[in-house]
Amino acid sequence: MKESYFMGIDTGTNSSKGVLINSHGEIIAEHTTEHAMTNPAPGHYEHDADKDWWGDLCIISNALIEKSKVSPSDIKAIGTSALGADCLPVDDQCRPLRKAILYGIDARATDEIEIGRAHV
């Protein structure tokens, strides 16, 4: 019987990581790629979704296939995870309208949060 493979990719704040495993849970290949946050103003932290998120997914999936020599048709599932509830406005074709605002570290709405807390 032909072996089945499973790919997992995680996009994080500073890097994206990927792993390819077989049906026994053995690691066949791993790959990590770094990406940078932009800091356009004090307390503002952003990612370029096309480059950092989609680009990393493409780089990692291709690297895992190349390193492992596994045929893409033998990969039965791909699981992804990513950083938390970031803000990425998109157009009607789901194309980013701006860089993503990173949840948890971007502080540009601090004043608005305090106003909201005062009314809860």
Question: Where would I find each of the regions flagged by the language model?
Answer:
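N-terminal glycine/serine-rich phosphate-binding loop of ATP-dependent small-molecule kinases
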Residues: M1-K99
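Carbohydrate-associated surface elements
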Residues: D106
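Conserved small/polar residues in nucleotide/adenosyl-binding loops
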Residues: A118-V120
